[in-house]
């Protein structure tokens, strides 16, 4: 570092002298010349190397010099590794040595001793030019040397090029060379830059440049930790850096100088501009355009050939294409490149993830961008420039864009190199073809080099400049803002979202290019999609869907095409995108095997795949959308789906971004993440047109969001390529399924869903999605259930609703779930459906939908969304658990309804109940399946759950609940019956269970049949756990529905309120149910089935179906089993769903393990919520009874910020719920819940609950018989109540005497909502309550709780619960029930203590981390 610093000073002075010596004109000329020469050199593989090397340090210096002199030192240290790595391969060692040496020499000759391997003949050769350039050509050599290089560009690349490049290198290297290690880093940056320019090298040296590529790539790999930081900046991997360094650098050329020296930055800017806009560069493009087209066409024709040929271009396609090694090759190759990056980048999840992601995925995608976008850009270099110019606000950004392009040029070519490095192992196979193609590809590599810039423009600019650049940027920016506001998780997403924006620009170009170069089907698909997006998309999707529905692996295969259209849609975010998607749906067969692999990868990688897929697909999708629109159809499709998924995922993640927690649920579950991807896909289809900035806007949020989206960002890092594929496949599969279903339903739901999705697409897309998508869920509940998972499952539910109608989709959904077996597979299927559904839906309605929903969800989105999303993520993560996805749906619904999606959430829930008919019809009337969808929204939640359950294998218990709950409404909704029965069955089983939990006729039953009721109640609590997440939304709808039909649903609402007290209507239901008394529920339970028909009664019926089911389950083991089956009645249900409730609990209570708050916003929210919780607890302690009504109602709202409540509130509730819920909750529920807690809490909860129905659970104090509304998140010993007056969260310790009486039930509700709620199982509460605190603290605890206690709750609820609950009931009911407060304290003392210990601290921590 010392010599490096010296040199840095030297270099600075050098750069300064260069700056002064070379006047602006000269510098610009030299830059332009350099770029022109580089472009030509890229065209001529040979002359580019030295220039690349020399220039690479320059660019590196600019990029990394300012940012990473330290890092450069680090990288330099690792540069030794790099230099050593080059030695690993003969060519690579030579090439890498050359690269390293030149940069190192650029840094200084001192560097050579440090990296001894560097001084190789090539290196020395480079050295000499560098030295000469540095010494003699500093001012002149820039222009002179570049001119010289141009003269020799085509003849001699190294000698003439190094001098021209050397001065830039000198400019930078002196500064950069200051640390020898820095120099190495720059050398690596050089490698990056060289890679950027290396496309020529990669062309030359893909034969021999793989040495260089590998060396740089490996240097990058060693350097990746830093490179993740600074090289990330240099690299396309710059997502991190894009957020940090490239953001400034990319957004404006001036920032580039800011990043590096002004002169350098300027240099680079002109260079990049020159490369992209200058004639020389364009000449290179044009010169190689024919070749590119040929190669592109060849790539289209022969994906394998294309992969080798477009090694950089096709790697993505190639990797996906090798279906056999799709997971492996793409990942193996990507892993080689990516894991090298990842391993080093492990420290930098984002950067590393992007580096890891990008190296392989974006290596391919970016290289794909380079090659694939390049072909288009080359073909339409003018068009590219036109879009650049015609990108609206891209004129300023074009420079920045080119800055981005250039950094990406370095970065992407480095990815090319990284690809060589990482993929060289694989490319050993590909290498030969690649090398041949690279020999042939040099021109293409130039395009690649340029394209990586363009691709960088997509990806990097997507991050920073894209919002400005992209024509759709304004609407997208709105979305971007919403999404940015939605989450910092969109920091990364911004790249991806900008990729869509860029894609819009590129899409304009690509549309032209596609019209010119791409197969007619694409254009056809474009037009088709444009004019008949619904029908056309449905048809192609149907084609793809049928297979996905029928096939497990085929759906991915077929779905990939669907996804491809979706991706193309994302790419061509305008109507052409729809056509493209349609066309891709038609052309999907090409991607069937990659699709399957992609899907698998997605599954394997889950969210990681999502996140990586997003970014990579962003780059890939962009770049490969070019090929997609251009010749590289196969790649385009592969990449396009990726892109689209990326877009969609990130849109969704963007929407989820606002709630990192929501994004975390994405991370939580692939389904969620992929749902995000799908929703994002949809939103990116439709919303990209307006959401380009949504993702562009995600620059800041993107990084957090990706983190949000993937707590498993490392996962992302590790499985970028696979994930990208998975994403493709996921989106495709979802699209296929969704499209298949959508074809039945899409016509109806597409518009509304798109609207909702559009709304969801909004910044608070997740929340909006939950709000509007809840409505959409009402129309297409699948989409609603989880904003991220919702999307998947909504589509799956649509698919299932239509599968019920269309038999197969739902079956296929179940099949997919079964065949995919894993939650991942299931989620994938769901994601497929969702991707598919969103693919058709979002394009048209996503935009307008996007914003309206955002408004709704934005009201409480910032905190709640993050809270819910982590919750959902946790649930999603545990989606493999049967309840995870359903619960995710519910949390999403919760958030949606909480956010502003209360109506939407209730809509979704009400679709479960009457609102399904009321809200959904309105929401879904757009959907032809208004009632079906309306019921479908009911079963969208339910069917989402069912789908999710089905894919989780939890379907087995879903169907019983389906039948028992759904049967009653099923007759009412005869036509919808099938779709609704399954969807509603699922809904009732899932949401229905919650509603049943709310419908816990147990109260009357408990009043009379304490033990049976208790099992029932326990059951409901059980179910309520997951049901509270599910039932909270259900409560929301029930509340909503029941609020409309409060009197009639009042008994059911009471039961609903019990489980879904969180639901606003549930509150009123509680109120009225309290008035109606516990038995009134059951009395009105019969009316319930009738109300099923009517919106008002529907909720009641559903609730009462639930109540009946509860009674069945409570009174009868089989009904209970069904109940438990759906919620967690059966051990299977418990096993399958228990994990889900724990996931839910984890999410709801702590959402900590799976979803720590990754963004400052999330942390702040979590802390804020925690403080609010404390305040709320204190307040509630004071105003236990009074506040519980209001606070709890509001606590539901607060519970929306559930993590806070879970952190604090759940703790008290755990103790209370434990003892109280088993006997008290059950007994109390049946005893005094009607007048005491129900009325006060019902009305009070009613008022606050409507906003946060999903998070509230009504628990009864066994002693007082009062029912308290507990925030689902508040499952800790401390109950967090929301003070409606103060708007603060009051944390009430369950032990409080008053609280014990009123709060403990609330805490039970909180615990039950979290853990208890999975079934409102008092016994599980008893058993689960202690676990609950732990479970809430961590998913394992929840899982333990869910598994150990939830079975008790399910079985104990219906079988054991009578004894256990009765026993506990007896011990607690007799012991504590009489003394409700004492009961609560007792529980707190006995059970709560560990709950409080674990729950309070852990949950709070988790809430702080994951709730916000």
From Swiss-Prot:
It holds the Pfam family DUF4585. Its main location: cytoplasm. It comes from the Eukaryota. Residues 106-177, 202-443, 460-500, 517-848, 877-923, 935-1255, 1344-1412 are annotated as: Disordered. Expressed in the heart and skeletal muscle (at protein level). Keywords: Cytoplasm, Phosphoprotein. This is Cardiac-enriched FHL2-interacting protein. The lineage of its organism: Eukaryota, Metazoa, Chordata, Craniata, Vertebrata.
């Amino acid at each position: 570092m010392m010599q490096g610093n010296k040199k840095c000073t030297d270099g600075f002075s050098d750069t300064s002298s260069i700056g002064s010596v070379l006047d602006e004109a000269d510098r610009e000329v030299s830059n332009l010349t350099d770029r022109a020469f580089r472009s030509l050199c890229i065209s001529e593989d040979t002359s580019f190397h030295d220039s690349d090397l020399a220039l690479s340090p320059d660019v590196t210096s600019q990029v990394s010099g300012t940012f990473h002199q330290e890092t450069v030192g680090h990288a330099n240290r690792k540069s030794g590794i790099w230099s050593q790595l080059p030695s690993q391969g003969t060519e690579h060692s030579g090439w890498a040595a050359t690269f390293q040496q030149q940069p190192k020499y650029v840094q200084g000759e001192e560097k050579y001793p440090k990296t001894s391997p560097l001084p190789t003949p090539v290196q020395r050769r480079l050295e000499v030019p560098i030295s000469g350039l540095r010494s003699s050509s500093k001012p002149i050599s820039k222009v002179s040397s570049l001119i010289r290089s141009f003269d020799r560009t085509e003849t001699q690349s190294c000698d003439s090029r190094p001098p021209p490049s050397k001065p830039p290198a000198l400019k930078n290297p002196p500064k950069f060379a200051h640390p020898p290690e820095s120099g190495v880093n720059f050398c690596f940056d050089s490698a990056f830059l060289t890679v950027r320019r290396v496309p020529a090298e990669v062309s030359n040296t893909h034969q021999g440049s793989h040495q260089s590529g590998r060396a740089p790539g490996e240097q990058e790999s060693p350097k990746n930790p830093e490179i993740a930081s600074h090289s990330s900046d240099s690299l396309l991997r710059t997502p991190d850096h894009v957020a940090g360094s490239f953001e400034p650098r990319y957004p404006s050329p001036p920032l580039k100088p800011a990043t590096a020296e002004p002169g350098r930055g300027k240099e680079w800017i002109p260079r990049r501009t020159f490369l992209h806009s200058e004639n020389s560069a364009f000449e290179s493009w044009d010169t190689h355009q024919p070749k590119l087209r040929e190669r592109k066409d060849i790539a289209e024709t022969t994906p394998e050939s294309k992969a080798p040929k477009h090694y950089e271009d096709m790697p993505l396609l190639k990797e996906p294409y090798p279906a056999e090694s799709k997971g492996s090759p793409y990942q193996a190759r990507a892993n080689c490149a990516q894991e090298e990056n990842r391993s080093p980048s492990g420290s930098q999840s984002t950067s590393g993830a992007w580096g890891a992601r990008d190296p392989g995925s974006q290596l391919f995608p970016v290289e794909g961008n380079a090659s694939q976008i390049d072909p288009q850009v080359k073909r339409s270099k003018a068009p590219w420039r036109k879009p650049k110019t015609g990108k609206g606000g891209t004129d300023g950004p074009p420079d920045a864009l080119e800055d981005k392009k250039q950094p990406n040029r370095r970065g992407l070519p480095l990815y090319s190199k990284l690809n060589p490095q990482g993929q060289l192992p694989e490319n050993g196979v590909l290498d030969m073809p690649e090398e041949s193609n690279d020999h042939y590809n040099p021109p293409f590599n130039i395009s690649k080099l340029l394209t990586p810039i363009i691709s960088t423009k997509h990806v990097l600019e997507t991050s920073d400049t894209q919002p400005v650049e992209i024509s759709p940027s304004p609407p997208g920016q709105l979305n971007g803002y919403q999404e940015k506001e939605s989450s910092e998780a969109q920091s990364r997403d911004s790249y991806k979202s900008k990729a869509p924006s860029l894609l819009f620009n590129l899409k304009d170009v690509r549309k032209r290019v596609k019209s010119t170069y791409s197969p007619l089907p694409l254009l056809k698909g474009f037009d088709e999609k444009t004019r008949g997006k619904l029908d056309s998309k449905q048809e192609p999707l149907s084609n793809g869907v049928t297979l996905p529905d029928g096939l497990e692996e085929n759906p991915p295969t077929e779905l990939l095409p669907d996804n491809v259209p979706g991706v193309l849609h994302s790419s061509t975010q305008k109507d052409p995108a729809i056509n493209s998607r349609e066309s891709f749906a038609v052309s999907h067969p090409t991607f069937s095997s990659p699709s399957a692999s992609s899907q698998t990868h997605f599954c394997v990688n889950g969210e990681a795949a999502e996140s990586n897929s997003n970014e990579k697909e962003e780059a890939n999708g962009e770049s490969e959308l070019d090929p997609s629109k251009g010749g590289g159809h196969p790649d385009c499709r592969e990449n396009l789906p990726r892109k689209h998924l990326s877009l969609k995922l990130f849109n969704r993640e963007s929407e989820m971004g606002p709630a990192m927690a929501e994004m975390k649920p994405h991370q939580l579950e692939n389904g969620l993440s992929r749902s995000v991807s799908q929703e994002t896909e949809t939103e990116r289809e439709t919303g990209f047109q307006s959401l380009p900035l949504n993702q562009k806007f995600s620059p800041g949020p993107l990084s957090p969001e990706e983190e949000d989206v993937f707590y498993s960002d490392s996962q992302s890092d590790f499985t970028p390529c696979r994930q990208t594929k998975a994403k493709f496949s996921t989106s495709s599969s979802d699209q296929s399924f969704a499209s298949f279903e959508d074809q039945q339903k899409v016509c109806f739901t597409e518009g509304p869903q798109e609207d909702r999705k559009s709304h969801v697409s909004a910044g608070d897309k997740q929340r909006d999605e939950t709000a509007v998508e809840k409505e959409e869920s009402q129309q297409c509940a699948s989409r609603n259930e989880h904003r991220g998972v919702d999307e998947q499952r909504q589509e799956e539910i649509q698919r299932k609703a239509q599968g019920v109608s269309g038999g197969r989709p739902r079956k296929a959904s179940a099949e997919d779930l079964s065949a995919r077996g894993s939650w991942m597979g299931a989620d994938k299927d769901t994601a497929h459906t969702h991707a598919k559904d969103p693919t058709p839906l979002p394009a048209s309605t996503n935009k307008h939908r996007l914003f309206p929903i955002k408004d709704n969800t934005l009201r409480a989105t910032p905190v709640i969304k993050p809270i819910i999303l982590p919750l959902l993520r946790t649930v999603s993560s545990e989606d493999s658990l049967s309840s995870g996805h359903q619960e995710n749906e519910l949390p999403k619904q919760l958030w949606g309804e909480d956010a502003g999606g209360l109506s939407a959430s209730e809509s979704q829930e009400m679709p479960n109940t009457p609102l399904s008919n009321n809200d959904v019809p309105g929401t879904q009337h757009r959907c032809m399946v208004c009632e079906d969808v309306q019921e479908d929204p009911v079963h969208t939640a339910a069917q989402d759950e069912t789908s999710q359950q089905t894919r989780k294998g939890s379907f087995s218990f879903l169907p019983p609940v389906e039948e028992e709950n759904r049967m009653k409404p099923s007759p009412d909704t005869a036509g919808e019956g099938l779709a609704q029965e399954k969807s509603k069955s699922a809904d009732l089983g899932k949401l229905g269970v919650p509603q049943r939990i709310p419908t816990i006729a147990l109260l009357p039953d408990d009043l009379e049949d304490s033990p049976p009721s208790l099992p029932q109640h326990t059951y409901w609590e059980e179910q309520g756990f997951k049901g509270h997440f599910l039932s909270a939304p259900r409560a929301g709808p029930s509340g909503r529905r029941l609020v409309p039909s409060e009197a009639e649903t009042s008994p059911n609402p009471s039961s609903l309120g019990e489980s879904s007290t969180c639901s606003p209507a549930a509150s009123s239901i509680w109120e009225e149910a309290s008035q109606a008394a516990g038995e009134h529920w059951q009395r009105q339970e019969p009316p319930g089935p009738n109300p099923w028909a009517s919106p008002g009664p529907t909720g009641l019926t559903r609730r009462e179906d639930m109540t009946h089911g509860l009674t069945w389950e409570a009174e009868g083991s089989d009904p209970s089993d069904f109940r438990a089956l759906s919620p967690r009645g059966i051990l299977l249900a418990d096993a399958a769903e228990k994990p889900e409730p724990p996931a839910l609990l984890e999410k709801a209570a702590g959402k900590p393990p799976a979803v720590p708050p990754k963004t400052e916003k999330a942390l702040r929210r979590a802390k804020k919520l925690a403080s609010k919780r404390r305040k709320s607890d204190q307040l509630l302690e004071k105003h236990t009874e009074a506040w519980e009504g209001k606070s709890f109602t509001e606590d539901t709202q607060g519970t929306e910020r559930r993590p806070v409540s879970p952190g604090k509130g759940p703790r008290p509730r755990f103790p209370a719920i434990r003892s109280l819920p088993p006997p008290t909750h059950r007994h109390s529920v049946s005893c005094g819940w009607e007048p005491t807690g129900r009325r006060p809490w019902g009305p009070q909860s009613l008022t606050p609950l409507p906003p946060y129905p999903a998070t509230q659970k009504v628990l009864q104090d066994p002693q007082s018989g009062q029912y308290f509304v507990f925030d689902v998140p508040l499952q800790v010993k401390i109950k967090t109540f929301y003070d409606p007056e103060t708007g603060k969260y009051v944390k009430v310790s369950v032990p409080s005497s008053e609280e014990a009486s009123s709060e403990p039930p609330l805490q039970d509700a909180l615990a039950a909502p979290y853990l208890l709620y999975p079934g409102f199982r008092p016994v599980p509460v008893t058993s689960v309550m202690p676990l609950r605190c732990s479970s809430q603290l961590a998913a394992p605890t929840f899982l333990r709780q869910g598994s150990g206690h939830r079975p008790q709750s399910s079985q104990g609820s219906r079988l054991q619960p009578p004894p256990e609950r009765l026993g506990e009931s007896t011990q607690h009911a007799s012991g504590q029930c009489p003394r409700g407060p004492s009961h609560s304290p007792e529980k707190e003392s006995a059970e709560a203590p560990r709950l409080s210990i674990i729950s309070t601290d852990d949950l709070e921590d988790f809430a702080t981390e994951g709730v916000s």
